[in-house]
Amino acid sequence: MNVEIIGEWAGKTWTALNEQGTLSMKGLKKATKLKEKELYAAIGWLAREGKLNISEAEEEIMISLI
């Protein structure tokens, strides 16, 4: 795993959120077709860049773009 690959996963994640709006972790995983660890790396990347809003609704983590 290298930085370029994580950047690609982050791009897939950003695109899914841009097209579909707020998604749960389960929905985001389905939309991106990423493995769980890949999705967490992508979310970390985008969160570090300040591009995500992460909240909890009914014990489910919800993610959207800022």
What is each stretch, according to the model?
Residues 1-13, 40-41, 59-61, 66:
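Short alpha-helical segments that sit at the start of domains
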Residues 3-31:
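Short amphipathic alpha-helical interface segments
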Residues 20, 34, 49:
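Residue-level signal for short amphipathic helical patches enriched in basic/charged
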Residues 27, 39, 56-57:
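Residue-level detector of family-conserved "landmark" positions at structurally sensitive sites
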Residues 34-45:
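Short amphipathic alpha-helical interaction segments
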Residues 47-57:
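A short, conserved structural fragment
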